[in-house]
Design a protein with these regions (language model features):
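A short, well-structured alpha-helix characteristic of acyl/acetyltransferase catalytic modules
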Residues: 7-19, 141-155, 261-263
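Active-site rim helix/loop that mediates acceptor-substrate recognition in acyltransferases
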Residues: 10, 15-61, 155-180
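Conserved beta-strand in the GNAT
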Residues: 43, 48-58, 66-73, 183-199
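Amide-forming acyltransferase catalytic core, primarily the GNAT-like/NAT-type
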Residues: 45, 114-199
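Conserved acetyl-CoA-binding loop-helix of GNAT-fold acetyltransferases
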Residues: 74-91, 101, 114, 208-220
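Conserved GNAT acetyl-CoA-binding A-motif
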Residues: 90-104, 223-233
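Conserved catalytic-core motifs of GNAT/GCN5-like acyltransferases
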Residues: 102, 118-133, 245-257
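C-terminal functional modules
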Residues: 233, 237, 241-272
Length: 272
């Protein structure tokens, strides 16, 4: 039986999620209660036990309402496929024109493709040497969740958008894992430092030079850094022609299909 989660299901949902995904109780609670909302959590019940779970997080893309399928886990591909069908059908009834997802594994990608999802939101990954430049100035960790939503809207409006409240959960998770946000009037970047390398998981700027200045400012802050690995949207206007293309997300249209060839999706709490 497929249904919405009830408060009494919490212990079973937590145990299933942790067994399948290995996240902390704090992370799971944040995902269920604050990122999706309990009213958007779907479960598959069999013989009085919760066997699968999936979250439907409200999002928008190009001004259209939709949902982000998150946290899909459970036993049995048929059960999971049925849960995906149920979630998508219910979201369509609620007015969603599409459902997006970030597959957690090749098997999940295949399952979603079988359910009508298609690949979208490809990324480009590129290494860059970072020059020393004492004159490159920027601010650090001054961007709020609300501001991050506004910056995404400004620099790449064709982005799968979360509300500021949902983005606050994502930002909290990023900070807990050691992320730093560098920003200026011309752009911003979110990065992790590992040894002598900066890994930018999101970088948006007016042009290549503005992006380079952000990286240079980050290098001055982190001192021993010499290079960066940047991940941007495949269609993003930075360092065009550079980098290796990577698959990332998927989309299923619940209404009239629309063009998502230049659309961007990233930082969807999927690395918890």
């Amino acid at each position: 039986m497929y249904r919405l989660m009830q408060p009494s299901d919490w212990a079973e949902v937590l145990a299933l999620w942790q067994a399948q995904r290995g996240d902390t109780e704090e992370f799971v609670r944040g995902a269920v209660e604050r990122f999706a909302g309990v009213q958007n959590v779907y479960v598959a019940e069999e013989n009085d036990h919760i066997e699968a779970v999936a979250l439907a997080v409200p999002v928008t893309l190009q001004g259209r309402p939709g949902s982000y399928l998150f946290g899909l886990c459970g036993q049995g591909s048929l059960l999971l496929a049925g849960l995906v069908d149920t979630l998508c059908a219910q979201q369509k009834l609620r007015g969603a024109g599409f459902v997006v997802a970030v597959p957690a594994s090749p098997e999940q990608s295949t399952l979603l493709q079988d359910k009508g999802f298609q690949k979208a939101f490809a990324l480009r990954c590129l290494p860059r040497e970072v020059e020393r430049n004492l004159w490159s100035q920027a601010e650090f960790d001054s961007v709020t969740a609300k501001k991050l939503c506004e910056l995404r809207e400004r620099f790449w409006p064709d982005t799968v958008m979360l509300t500021p409240e949902k983005m606050a959960v994502v930002l909290g998770d990023l900070y807990s894992r050691g992320a730093t946000i560098v920003s200026s009037e011309q752009g911003y970047g979110i990065y992790f430092r590992k040894e002598d390398t900066l890994y930018f998981v999101e970088l948006m700027a007016e042009d290549d030079r503005s992006a380079e200045k952000l990286m240079e400012a980050a290098r001055e802050k982190e001192v021993i850094v010499e290079k960066a690995v940047i991940t941007v949207g495949a269609a993003q206007n930075l360092f065009l022609g550079e980098g290796t293309r990577q698959d990332y997300g998927m989309i299923r249209f619940e209404g009239e299909p629309f063009d998502v060839s230049e659309s961007y999706m990233r930082l969807m709490l999927e690395n918890g």
